[in-house]
UniProtKB/Swiss-Prot annotation:
<dbReference type="GO" id="GO:0006412">
    <property type="term" value="P:translation"/>
</dbReference>
<dbReference type="GO" id="GO:0022627">
    <property type="term" value="C:cytosolic small ribosomal subunit"/>
</dbReference>
<comment type="function">
    <text>One of the primary rRNA binding proteins, it binds specifically to the 5'-end of 16S ribosomal RNA.</text>
</comment>
<protein>
    <recommendedName>
        <fullName>Small ribosomal subunit protein uS17</fullName>
    </recommendedName>
</protein>
<dbReference type="InterPro" id="IPR019979">
    <property type="entry name" value="Ribosomal_uS17_CS"/>
</dbReference>
<dbReference type="GO" id="GO:0003735">
    <property type="term" value="F:structural constituent of ribosome"/>
</dbReference>
<keyword id="KW-0687">Ribonucleoprotein</keyword>
<dbReference type="InterPro" id="IPR019984">
    <property type="entry name" value="Ribosomal_uS17_bact/chlr"/>
</dbReference>
<comment type="similarity">
    <text>Belongs to the universal ribosomal protein uS17 family.</text>
</comment>
<dbReference type="InterPro" id="IPR012340">
    <property type="entry name" value="NA-bd_OB-fold"/>
</dbReference>
<comment type="subunit">
    <text>Part of the 30S ribosomal subunit.</text>
</comment>
<dbReference type="InterPro" id="IPR000266">
    <property type="entry name" value="Ribosomal_uS17"/>
</dbReference>
<keyword id="KW-0689">Ribosomal protein</keyword>
<dbReference type="Pfam" id="PF00366">
    <property type="entry name" value="Ribosomal_S17"/>
</dbReference>
<keyword id="KW-0694">RNA-binding</keyword>
<keyword id="KW-0699">rRNA-binding</keyword>
<dbReference type="GO" id="GO:0019843">
    <property type="term" value="F:rRNA binding"/>
</dbReference>
Length: 83
């Protein structure tokens, strides 16, 4: 069972909020879920630093994939643009 999961990399879809660094973008990934106790829909977001080889711009929707550590904070890379 564990062998099926091994080697699979996580992917997330988010919006580029900053592209001011060289070959690095900040991607905001939103998560919507129902609160277990209060049954209210909660919107939560996380920011990920991702390696940018595709030259995506601020405002683009992108798919990012987990990768080996590229720097102190970068552990994701941009795979493609999502329309």
């Amino acid at each position: 069972m564990a062998s099926d999961v091994r080697g699979r990399r996580k992917t997330k879809i988010g919006v580029v909020v900053s592209s001011k660094m060289e070959k690095t973008v900040v991607v905001r990934v939103e998560r919507v879920y129902s609160h277990p106790q209060y049954a209210k829909v909660v919107r939560d977001s996380s920011k990920y630093y991702a390696h940018n080889e595709l030259d995506v711009k601020e405002g683009d929707t992108v798919r990012i994939q987990e990768t080996r550590p590229l720097s102190k904070t970068k552990r994701w890379r941009v795979v493609d643009r999502v329309n």
